[in-house]
């Protein structure tokens, strides 16, 4: 079963990107603050009879210089945020990275490009941008969640290193949940906004884990993760309910499968008709076959 053409969760991903931008900035700042200071070389011993250089007055360290052109270029990129401007934004972002490879905004640019490449289904470019963002900040929640979610939805078991990539996606989602549990509230978000942004990210992480375990046919853990995600999801995901229905049906928990399919059928989209048909099948099985054991 392939979900390569099923992207009912992309709306949730887009919401996550918007809500999670402040989370991304927060984790970036937090990560930078946690980095150990670079070791300074030991002072050269002073010649005999002369004062040690370490005792001499030291000039204060200069603040990083701000390049007005760099700031302007980033603002132009940041403000080009309408969905129909994706091609322009990609061009601006790629130009920015070439011209300002050491900019303090590089991580945010890569994270935004990751989303744009995903929207265009240029997955190789998406993964490359994500890897570069995580190389700068391994705690970027948005990047961790999105890449961990996308891979199991586009999983190909015949791909080289398919299981390795599933394991990498699993590690990203688990790390994202760990970061979220410790994340301080950014100053520019209210308590309510922060809670919603965290729930959005956590819901997508649980959804990603659910699909990863589904690909491994670990249905019990998959169901647990998908249910955890749906409990806090602002927007229900038809794919998650469909997968739960498939798993519950395989476990002969037909009544629960019918309930999952029914929830899927109520969500407008490509899966609605299929889920309606599956609902009827599961209800029929529930009335004619013995139910499987519950966990």
Outline where the language-model segments fall:
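Residue-level recognition of tetratricopeptide repeat
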Residues: 115, 149, 153-156, 211, ...
């Amino acid at each position: 079963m392939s979900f390569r053409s099923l992207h009912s969760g992309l709306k949730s991903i887009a919401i996550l990107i918007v809500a999670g931008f402040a989370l991304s900035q927060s984790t970036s700042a937090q990560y930078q603050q946690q980095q150990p200071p670079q070791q300074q070389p030991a002072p050269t011993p002073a010649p005999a009879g002369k004062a040690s250089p370490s005792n001499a007055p030291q000039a204060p360290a200069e603040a990083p210089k701000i390049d007005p052109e760099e700031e302007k270029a980033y603002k132009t990129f940041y403000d080009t945020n309408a969905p129909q401007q994706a091609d322009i934004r990609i061009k601006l972002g790629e130009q920015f990275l070439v011209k300002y490879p050491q900019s303090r905004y590089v991580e945010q640019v890569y994270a935004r490009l990751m989303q744009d490449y995903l929207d265009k289904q240029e997955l190789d470019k998406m993964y490359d941008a994500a890897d570069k963002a995580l190389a700068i900040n391994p705690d970027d929640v948005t990047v961790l969640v999105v890449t961990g979610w996308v891979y199991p939805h586009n999983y190909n078991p015949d791909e080289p290193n398919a299981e390795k990539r599933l394991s990498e996606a699993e590690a990203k989602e688990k790390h994202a949940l760990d970061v979220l549990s410790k994340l301080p509230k950014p100053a520019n978000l209210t308590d309510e906004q922060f809670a919603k942004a965290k729930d959005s990210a956590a819901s997508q992480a649980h959804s990603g884990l659910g699909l990863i375990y589904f690909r491994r046919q670990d249905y019990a853990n998959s169901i647990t993760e998908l249910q955890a995600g749906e409990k806090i999801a602002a927007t229900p995901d038809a794919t998650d309910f469909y997968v739960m229905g498939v798993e519950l049906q395989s476990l002969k928990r037909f009544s629960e499968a019918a309930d999952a399919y029914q929830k899927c059928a109520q969500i407008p989209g490509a899966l609605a008709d299929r889920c309606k048909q599956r609902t009827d099948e599961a209800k029929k099985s529930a009335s004619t076959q013995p139910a499987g054991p519950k966990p």
